[in-house]
Amino acid sequence: MAQELTETYIWQRYRRGVTHHSRQNLYEQTAKAFRFFEGDQWHGVFSAEELPVYNFIAPTVEYKTAMVSMQQMQIVYTSNDPSGGKEAERICADLNEYARQHWEAQKMDTLCWRIVRDACISGDAYVYFYNRNLDAQVIDNTAVYLADEQQRDLQKQEYIILYERRPVNDVKRDAKKNGLKKELIEQITPDEDTETVVGDDTEVKGDGKCSCLLYLWRDDNGEIHIARSTQTVIYQPDTPITGLTKYPMASFVWIPKKNSARGTGEVLPIIPNQIEANRLLARRLISAKMNAFAKPVYVKNLIENPADVENVGKAIAVKTASVQSVQDIFTYIAPAPMSQEAGILQADLIQTTRDLAGAGDAALGQINPERASGAAIIAVRDQAAVPLNEQIAMFKQFVEDVALVWIDLWRAYHPEGLTIPAQQTDGIVRLDRIAPEAFDELRLTVRIDASPTNPFSKYAREEALERALAAGQITFAEYVEALPDDASAPKEAFRAILEKRADQPDGMMPPAGPGEGGGQMI
């Protein structure tokens, strides 16, 4: 008789989380929100032909995602230890540079766009840092199971469970590496448990996948432990991460729900309006097909070639000459006029929905930049973006949470001290070491500096620099140094020209720019 397999305690807690998510209808609502954003807005409706879609949800989401994500964030570590002096300043400067390097290495700008967009669509999104290199993975809200679904602060959770689908061979390899017995490894088999997977759950046929859980919890001493489990096998036993006191995760919630750790996105509230706009469009097209074009009407037995009625340029032959007018045998029904009310209602529905969502034409940037200055465009944009100030503030908090998690990970994975490469002005790389006790002694805090970065902001900055140069208020060299690195003007090319000039004798110098005694810019 085969031995009955029992679920692990981790899987049982996961099942309780699934029950909660199902009660909240989280899986279906999230899937529905993503379908409408992606344009699959007639899901479940069967028709002989393609049905029309007027997708105003996607530009609304993309605009709001851009307005939040274009806030250029910079992590700044500071010390709360007044006695730290120059040494504390050096350590904080090294950590700031180290954070900048990791931000670029992990492509956090791109990652943040994805997190913000997912949160805008589904209400909340999560990022998980899973190794000493701070490699990150974006986690769907439906794959996160919290011990307390009313507690918004992840760091106050008793435990957190992350769900994922993994190839069976990879799981077995990890189980063998962790010293599991052969009979336990053989219990790891493919399954079809995709009921909680949102999006395309079609898997490539092969050795199969199985559902896996990452279980994170904090012991009484405040230290984080991890374990991994399938439904019946814990293939990575409980493992403490020495020195790690924070869950290596951060969450971004779009619109917080009252008394809930979850959030509400932009999509679900406007889906009824999107459906009605699509229905109106479909009805108008059907009406146009039925009534907007003239239809031939004829006496069939008096037409010699009825098959040619629909052919362009073909003559229609009649079988009799006893009629007074050919219109008695063959004529057209005039097109019926279409009421404009349906079109007006549809346009008004779409425009009102976009305006109420804060994503009208002005907000979406549908302004001719040739007819307005950069400052004017920015003023209009900033006024339209006022409703997003809460999301921008929460995005700053999200980046701050990431920065605090990074500090904890650095301390945990570098118990002997953190060595940071720092490039000096002369190009020589200096290795600075931060002792492990320094993290506690300095009592580090995080400040996030945010500044918007978008085409119109760049245009306004460069426009101001060009005016100052033209007015002689700055030199050309100062203009080049003041240009941002991502300016549309070729900063590096200008810098190379200046270096070439510096190497030439004074007599061979070309004419100076407007800020250097007149002439052209170069």
What do these predicted ranges mean?
Residues 1-225, 229-231, 308, 337, ...:
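Extended, helix-rich architectural segments
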Residues 54, 61, 84, 169, ...:
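Intrinsically disordered, low-complexity segments enriched in proline/serine/threonine
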Residues 55, 140, 166-168, 265, ...:
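Helix N-terminus capping/helix-initiation residues
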Residues 85-92, 105-109, 266-274, 278, ...:
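Generic detection of long, well-ordered alpha-helical segments
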Residues 223-313, 479:
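Catalytic nucleotidyl-transfer cores of nucleotide-processing enzymes
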